[in-house]
Regions:
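Binuclear metal-dependent hydrolase catalytic cores
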Residues: 1-116, 196-219
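Cap/insert and terminal regions of metallo-dependent hydrolase folds
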Residues: 105, 112-116, 122-216
Length: 220
């Protein structure tokens, strides 16, 4: 029913317009609903403006019946977002990804289960509190970067690490919050030694650690 955006970095929003179009192509007959930080509407409106001529040609030529699927509803979070439907509750969490701000994680409550999703963040006390006794904490992790003077400076190394969470940060937060299972995602860089990463985090967290992959499914 809704798409939740954590922050306005390109790797989190670049496919948003294609999701809008693909959902319409595959039969969505209700508005495309997006929730995220202030600035989301401006971003999406500018993207839609760039594709307006192409979309108008599609609409005129393809004659699809589901016109409602092209309606858009954008909610920009003002302090806090809360959503409830069919026994599921979602709450936003403001996290620390400066200079990108605001940035959010999300809590999901399903029956008696609690899932917390970090979004991109350095160590965040808000996130720690929101993760207390969570059944699952899904958390990003900065693994490491090797210096390459063709694509980075020393400042690059320092600054990229500084607005993400190290393995120690992730493990310490999960332990402090008494998280039952920790699922790692959003790896920087994307290629790394999984067992070494789990071993490093397990120095600080004694629960189950799962290295997440796209399309993984977990039973609550």
């Amino acid at each position: 029913d809704i798409i939740l955006i954590t922050h306005l970095h390109s790797d989190h929003i670049v496919d948003l317009y294609q999701l809008y179009i693909s959902g319409w192509h595959t039969g969505r007959a209700k508005p495309f609903k997006i929730v995220g930080p202030i600035g989301l509407k401006k971003f999406f409106d500018k993207t839609a403006e760039a594709y307006a001529d192409e979309l108008n040609l599609r609409v005129d030529w393809e004659k699809r019946p589901n016109h409602k699927g092209l309606d858009i509803e954008i909610t920009e979070i003002d302090n806090e977002f809360i959503y409830e439907k069919m026994g599921i509750k979602i709450k936003s969490i403001e996290v620390q990804h400066q200079p990108v701000e605001p940035a959010y994680g999300y809590q999901f409550f399903v029956d008696d289960k609690k899932i917390t999703y970090s979004g991109d963040t350095r160590y965040s006390i808000n996130l720690e509190k929101a993760s207390e006794d969570a059944d699952y904490l899904i958390h990003e992790v900065f693994v490491s970067l090797n210096f390459d003077d063709k694509r980075m400076t020393q400042d690059t190394l320092v600054n990229v690490k500084e607005y993400h969470s190290t393995p120690k940060d992730v493990g310490t937060l999960a332990q402090a919050a008494n998280v039952k299972k920790l699922i790692l995602n959003h790896f920087v860089p994307p290629v790394f030694d999984e067992e070494s990463l789990k071993a490093e985090i397990s120095q600080y967290y004694d629960g189950e650690i799962i290295v997440g992959n796209d399309l993984d499914e977990f039973i609550l």
